[in-house]
């Protein structure tokens, strides 16, 4: 599978939806990347922690990347938006 197919983009939906999507990818024995921007970053961290502590206890963090993206706002100004990518390795 490609890297984009193993990515879960966290947004406004309930946290457990993202936990289940991530769990399905990890159960195939593949790595999964949880991505989020802005206010959804805390939800992405929640997804990973719920997964590690309640469902797939052997899941490991493989990599965590933090970045800032510049987006053009409605008024034409550039806004800085934080983003996170958390790579999870399946349990052994």
Model-derived features: positions:
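Structured beta-strand/turn binding interfaces of compact recognition modules in eukaryotic regulators
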Residues: 13, 37, 89
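Short amphipathic alpha-helical interaction elements and helix-loop-helix interfaces
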Residues: 28, 32, 53-57, 92
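Beta-strand cores of modular interaction/reader domains in eukaryotic scaffold and signaling proteins
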Residues: 9, 33-35, 85-87
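Histone-fold modules and their flanking histone-like tails across chromatin and transcription assemblies
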Residues: 1-26
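Short glycine-rich, basic-tinged beta-strand/loop micro-motifs
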Residues: 26-42
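Conserved helicase motor "Helicase C" RecA-like lobe of SF1/SF2 P-loop NTPases
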Residues: 39-56
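Core residues of folded domains in eukaryotic genome-function proteins
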Residues: 4-6, 28-30, 80-84
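C-terminal edge-of-domain segments
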Residues: 61-92
């Amino acid at each position: 599978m490609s890297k984009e197919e193993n990515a879960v983009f966290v947004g406004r939906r309930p946290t457990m939806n993202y936990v289940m999507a991530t769990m399905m990818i990890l159960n195939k024995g593949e790595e999964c990347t949880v991505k989020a921007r802005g206010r959804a970053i805390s939800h992405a961290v929640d997804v990973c922690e719920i997964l590690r502590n309640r469902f797939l206890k052997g899941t490991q963090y493989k990599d965590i990347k933090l970045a800032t993206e510049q987006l053009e706002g409605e008024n034409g100004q550039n806004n800085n938006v934080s983003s996170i990518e958390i790579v999870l390795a399946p349990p052994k």
